[in-house]
Amino acid sequence: MAKKLTATVELMLPAGQATPAPPVGPALGQHGINIMEFVKQFNAASKDMEPGTIVPVVISIYADRSFTFIMKTPPTSFLLKKAAKVQKGSSDPKRQKAGKITLNQLKEIAQLKAKDMNTQDLDAVMRTIAGTARSMGIEIEGYKG
């Protein structure tokens, strides 16, 4: 018989740098999960990623207090800021541009994000990411969406 799922917790954690401090401790502690065990498993699973990369993680908690987790790709905004080498997006994206990325960088981000999207069409993923870039004030050189 399959384990009974009791809760699902979604967190955004830095790769390889999770600690039992908030937000991990309180989020998992209230469900009776061994927090250190999760921290060790998460840090081991994310050790190959660049340190500090924000990683969304979905933790499934079962009735017997065991858990499984799925790591997703970093948020699109994080990848765009990293590619454009900016700290944050523009507060007024129509008038003020925060930075620029190339068409190749857009394609790389789209290929990385494709597995988390609800489509496998790379052009559709690129359009979605271009829309996010536009709303952040990041210009894409050579892209006519």
From Swiss-Prot:
SMART domains, sorted: RL11 (SM00649)
Post-translational modification: One or more lysine residues are methylated.
Alphabetized PROSITE patterns for the sequence: RIBOSOMAL_L11
Sorted UniProt keywords: Methylation, Ribonucleoprotein, Ribosomal protein, RNA-binding, rRNA-binding
Pfam family, one: Ribosomal_L11
Keyword rRNA-binding: yes
Domain of life of the native organism: Bacteria
GO BP term, pick one: translation
Gene3D superfamilies, sorted: Ribosomal protein L11, C-terminal domain, Ribosomal protein L11/L12, N-terminal domain
Family: Belongs to the universal ribosomal protein uL11 family.
Function: Forms part of the ribosomal stalk which helps the ribosome interact with GTP-bound translation factors.
Protein name, as recorded: Large ribosomal subunit protein uL11
Gene source species: Hydrogenobaculum sp. (strain Y04AAS1)
Gene name per UniProt: rplK
